[in-house]
Amino acid sequence: NKFSTVSRQLKSYQNLALKNNLRIVKILLVAPEFSDDFIYDCEMDTEMNLSLLTASTLSKIFEVFKTSNYQEFPHVLFRDIVINEERIIKALTK
């Protein structure tokens, strides 16, 4: 299954970072879209702090962020498995 392949690769990167004394707070996986099965498998994974972000959502969030009052992106907005575009844009425009 596609998630197991992606998961193995991400865990490999995570282990490499840890060996170099780097701390990983969150892994953001960006893709054009995610299947329901992929999202389900991601939700069941307890080893990585992984969030899924579609490329179109990332682009929209970036455009709103550029016009927001924030100098640094509030990372707490990336707490979901599947990133909620509307919630983040609403928070950035407050």
PLM features per residue range, with description:
Residues 1-93:
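Catalytic core segments in nucleotide and nucleic-acid processing enzymes
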